[in-house]
Amino acid sequence: LSIRRQRQMCIRDRFHIAMQLISSPARAWEEISLEDRRKVFTAFVYPMIGLCGLSVFIGSLVAKGWGGPQSFQYAMTQCCEVAVSLFGGYFLAAYLINGLRVRMFAMDNDIPLVQQFAGYALVVSFMLKIIIGILPDFSIIALLLQFYIVYVVWEGSAILMKIAEKDRLRFTILSSMLLIACPAVIEFVFNKLTVVLN
């Protein structure tokens, strides 16, 4: 296949898995459990972070106008904020969830598995950032929809993470809190540093 055709297939596959995770998480987690754990970075997380950044960049330019260097600087700052918060939040959440598995649930230390889980579980955050980047008026609705991540994590906890049924609710709540809070905390710190450094 040509390189262009392969890229089109990759983009289609990314959106297919994202839509499946949102519409039918159990079936999506079954498919994900069969794939290479390291594939999550290049096949899903990095492209989704890139799309989130692009969406916010375009939305910021549209909101602030195209004229002047200030509008471009603002758009770049917003783009970096989203990319840094999602990237750092993803790795921080994965690290903390792995620690949670080891300490609270007496499971093996398995960073690649947890990175795969966290990457795909963040699908709700990724999709909302893409939509809010272009349509910022939906921020309140997005805040409420953010908690759909709990259902995605609930399904993934049994299928991919193999959490025992008795521990599943506790794992789901704690993991969901980490997946929502870690990017938010990093975004807050990034914003404060941006203000201080300007």
Language-model segments: which ranges?
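Single conserved hydrophobic/aromatic residue that forms the stacking wall/gate
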Residues: 1-11
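Hydrophobic core of alpha-helical transmembrane segments in multi-pass integral membrane proteins
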Residues: 52-53, 57, 179-185
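Juxtamembrane boundary at the C-terminal end of a transmembrane helix
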Residues: 184-198
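Hydrophobic alpha-helical transmembrane segments and adjacent short intramembrane/lumenal linkers
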Residues: 98-184
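Helix-loop junctions at the membrane-solvent interface of multi-pass transporters
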Residues: 62, 134-135, 189
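Selected alpha-helical membrane-embedding segments in polytopic membrane proteins
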Residues: 12-109
